[in-house]
C-alpha cells in the first residue's frame, strides 16, 4: 500500500491573495504581501455579493453623472466622449468626499469576510472630511517646498547639475505622492472596535517628515507640518513601523488608482485591502 500523498504547498505569493496573517519574515516577504493586498481586496469584493453591491453604487452614480454631463452638450459622439473623460478626470477626487460614508460602511462590512472580528464603521462628518482633504492638499504642496528651494539653489550656484537634479526632484515628488496615497487608503480602512476605550489617544511620536525639518531655521515649518498631519497619526505610525509593507501596499494601490475611471472602479478594492492590512497589523502587535 502506498502512503497517502499530501497536497503540494501553496506558493507564498498565491497564499497572499487569500486572507491571512502577516508573513513571519520581514523584508521582501512583507513587501510582496503588501503588494498583493489590492488584488486580495478586489478578489474579496467580487466574491462577496453584499460587498460587490455596496461597491457598485458609487461607480454607477458617478459614472452616470458624467454621462449626463456629456449627453447635455450638443457635440458629436467624439466630442461627448471627450467631455465625459474630462468630467471624469476633473471630478476624480470627488467620490472620496461624496461616497465617504459608503466606503466606511464597506470597510466595516469587509472585516468578517476577511477573517477579522466584526466592528462598526468609523463615520467622520462631511465637514471633517472636507477639512482633511484640504489639509492633505496643503501638505502635498508645501511638503515639496524644500525640494523647490533646493532646485533653485542648484540652478543658481551649480547650473551644470540642474538637469540631473530634476530627476531627483521627480523621484522625491513621486515618493511624497505615494506616501500620501498610502495614508489616505489606510485612513479609509479604519473601523471602530466597540470594546476599545473611548477616545483612545493617537500616537504622539512626530512623523518622519516633521522630524526631518526640526532644525533651528525651520522649526516653524516643522510645527506647521505637525499640525496639518495630526489627523493621520495612526496611519503615519504604521508607515514608520512597517515600511516594507506600506511600500508594497502603496505601489499596488497606486497602480490601481493611476487611471481616473479605473480608480473609481478599484477604490473599493483598495478600501478592503486597507481593512485587511490594518486588521493583520493589529493582530500581530504585542499586547499593550
Annotate the PLM regions:
Residues 77-114, 154-223, 261-285:
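Selective recognition of hydrophobic, aromatic-rich stretches within alpha-helical transmembrane segments
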Residues 1-152, 213-237, 241-245, 249-253, ...:
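Helix-coil boundary and N-terminal low-complexity module in membrane systems
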Amino acid at each position: 500500500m502506498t502512503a497517502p500523498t499530501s497536497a503540494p504547498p501553496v506558493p507564498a505569493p498565491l497564499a497572499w491573495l487569500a486572507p491571512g496573517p502577516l508573513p513571519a519574515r520581514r523584508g521582501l516577504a512583507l513587501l510582496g504581501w503588501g503588494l498583493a493586498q489590492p488584488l486580495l481586496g478586489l478578489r474579496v469584493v467580487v466574491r462577496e455579493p453584499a460587498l460587490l453591491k455596496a461597491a457598485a453604487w458609487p461607480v454607477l452614480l458617478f459614472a452616470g453623472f458624467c454621462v449626463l454631463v456629456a449627453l447635455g452638450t450638443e457635440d458629436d459622439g467624439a466630442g461627448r466622449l471627450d467631455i465625459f473623460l474630462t468630467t471624469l478626470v476633473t471630478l476624480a477626487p470627488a467620490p472620496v468626499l461624496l461616497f465617504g460614508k459608503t466606503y466606511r460602511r464597506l470597510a466595516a462590512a469587509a472585516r468578517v469576510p476577511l477573517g477579522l472580528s466584526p466592528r462598526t464603521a468609523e463615520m467622520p462628518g462631511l465637514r471633517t472630511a472636507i477639512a482633511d482633504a484640504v489639509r492633505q492638499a496643503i501638505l502635498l504642496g508645501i511638503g515639496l517646498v524644500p525640494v523647490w528651494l533646493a532646485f533653485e539653489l542648484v540652478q543658481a550656484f551649480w547650473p551644470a547639475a540642474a538637469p540631473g537634479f530634476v530627476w531627483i526632484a521627480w523621484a522625491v515628488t513621486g515618493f511624497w505622492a505615494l506616501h500620501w496615497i498610502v495614508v489616505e487608503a489606510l485612513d479609509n480602512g479604519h473601523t471602530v472596535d466597540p470594546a476599545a476605550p473611548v477616545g483612545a489617544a493617537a500616537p504622539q511620536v512626530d512623523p518622519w517628515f516633521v522630524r526631518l525639518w526640526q532644525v533651528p531655521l525651520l522649526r516653524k515649518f516643522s510645527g506647521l507640518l505637525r499640525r496639518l498631519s495630526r489627523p493621520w497619526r495612526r496611519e503615519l505610525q504604521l508607515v514608520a513601523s512597517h515600511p516594507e509593507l506600506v511600500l508594497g501596499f502603496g505601489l499596488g494601490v497606486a497602480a490601481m488608482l493611476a487611471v481616473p475611471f479605473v480608480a473609481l472602479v478599484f477604490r473599493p478594492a483598495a478600501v478592503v485591502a486597507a481593512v485587511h492590512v490594518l486588521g493583520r497589523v493589529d493582530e500581530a502587535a504585542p499586547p499593550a
